[in-house]
Amino acid sequence: MREVISLNVGQAGCQIANSCWELYCLEHGIQPDGYLTEERKAAEDDDGFSTFFSETGNGKYVPRTIYADLEPNVVDEVRTGTYRSLFHPELMITGKEDASNNYARGHYTVGKELIDQVLDKVRHVADNCSGLQGFLVFHSFGGGTGSGFGALLMERLSVDYGKKCKLEFCVYPAPQVATSVVEPYNSILTTHTTLEHSDCSFMVDNEAIYDICRRNLGIERPNYENLNRLIAQVVSSITASLRFDGSLNVDLNEFQTNLVPYPRIHFPLVAYAPIVSAAKAAHEANSVQEISMSCFEPNSQMVKCDPRNGKYMATCLLYRGDVVPKDVHQAVATLKTKRTIQFVDWCPTGFKIGICYQPPQNVPNGDLAKVNRAVCMLSNTTAIAEAWSALSHKFDLMYSKRAFVHWYVGEGMEEGEFSEAREDLAALERDYEEVAADSAEGDEGGEAEY
């Protein structure tokens, strides 16, 4: 069996996880107490979800997931919430004091006390797996726990499970909805630390998701639950191929193989369609062609950037629901004729396709309409570098005045780590520029490479 362990770090990680497990349970017919629903028991046997759930002796299903936060409030809500009997109580680990939006506290002082306890539980869950495939790590860039403790966890996982692949789902700080002023510092420090430890990072930008909720779903003032439920749909689409049998299965390593041309360039842009509210759903056809096209629209993307300014290196289209390969091939053929989708010239215009026949589920009374097919697009495009440059600019404004730096140094960090992280990010931006620059220009004298 190819199991996957989810690790949820900090407030953002834990709250996104709540929405994800709520959705997984609906998709697999598991009740909030961990037992299968009657309809599910009657249905034919499908053990695909044992990648995400382990079964106990008395037929209860327990998520293979660990909650870790340096302060107890968010995890306490899970401990007392609807799904309190679903999760294993020992796999919810909380500290006493939070990281107070400070990367250094999450990574050095406060995080250091909790990390061994978390890794001990990871080992415990991993020992229950017959063939552990890898880890999904959910965290934010802006918070102290998400950035600092998240980075520390990634480092330690590399040491303990070097060969296993690690995918991140990270919440990118949104310009409009910042919760703390030092988000640019935390983001750049955590990106620098995790760059070599993560195999593939799916970034989610809060602002982009706010806009989707406002524009496509008509929610005037979206709250975190609205955002997280949308994120959960995306995560569910990405992991559907691991949990259900489809005609074209994708496992964790395949994401990497298909999306990451160079180890550092591992930040695919995620888009999802159709995102329609229940009120409008009846008037939309949502053909395979339509939803495939709308994935390339900027307003279905999870990060604010304009892919028309960049070039694509690789694209995965993950369909689910009522989709037949013939329609997909037609849709892809049409996409290839569109000149707006520009690939780098050293890469064939290949689209990796995955199809999972399980239709997308939706949360009762949720914002999203019930649809019979959906698609999630993961594309590695050079346009995502825009997100980095926006962040670097804010970092520079503050760091030029050394604003707030003393809080980090006071927690045992060296000031040199700031400039080191900033240089690493500048190098990352340059990597993206080089990839986008036409490779044909530099190759006149380079025949020897082939």
UniProtKB/Swiss-Prot annotation:
It catalyses: GTP + H2O = GDP + phosphate + H(+). PROSITE patterns: TUBULIN. Dimer of alpha and beta chains. A typical microtubule is a hollow water-filled tube with an outer diameter of 25 nm and an inner diameter of 15 nM. Alpha-beta heterodimers associate head-to-tail to form protofilaments running lengthwise along the microtubule wall with the beta-tubulin subunit facing the microtubule plus end conferring a structural polarity. Microtubules usually have 13 protofilaments but different protofilament numbers can be found in some organisms and specialized cells. Its main location: cytoplasm. The keyword DNA-binding does not apply. Belongs to the tubulin family. It comes from Zymoseptoria tritici (Speckled leaf blotch fungus). This is Tubulin alpha chain. It is found in: Cytoplasm, Cytoskeleton. Tubulin is the major constituent of microtubules, a cylinder consisting of laterally associated linear protofilaments composed of alpha- and beta-tubulin heterodimers. Microtubules grow by the addition of GTP-tubulin dimers to the microtubule end, where a stabilizing cap forms. Below the cap, tubulin dimers are in GDP-bound state, owing to GTPase activity of alpha-tubulin. Pfam families: Tubulin (PF00091), Tubulin_C (PF03953). The lineage of its organism: Eukaryota, Fungi, Dikarya, Ascomycota, Pezizomycotina. The active site is at 254.
